[in-house]
Amino acid sequence: DLLEALSQDQKLLMAKFLPHIYAELANREGNWHEDAALRPLHDHDYPGWMDF
């Protein structure tokens, strides 16, 4: 297993930086918008959903 071969310092670096790298890549590709993700759920529009 690749993760078992890593040192503790390498695992900590990965845990610290991978989320930032994924977010940056997603922003470049237009798959994820930070401002939209931070809005409260009740502000999102879900067409076809019924309000009770």
Swiss-Prot record:
Keyword Calcium: no
Principal location class: secreted
Listed GO CC annotations: extracellular region
Lineage: Eukaryota, Metazoa, Chordata, Craniata, Vertebrata
Entry keyword set: Digestion, Hormone, Secreted
Record has Secreted as a keyword: yes
Known role: May control digestion processes.
Record field: transmembrane: none
Protein name: Gastrin/cholecystokinin-like peptide
Family to which the UniProt record says this protein belongs: Belongs to the gastrin/cholecystokinin family.
Cellular location(s): Secreted
GO BP term, example: digestion
Annotated GO MF terms: hormone activity
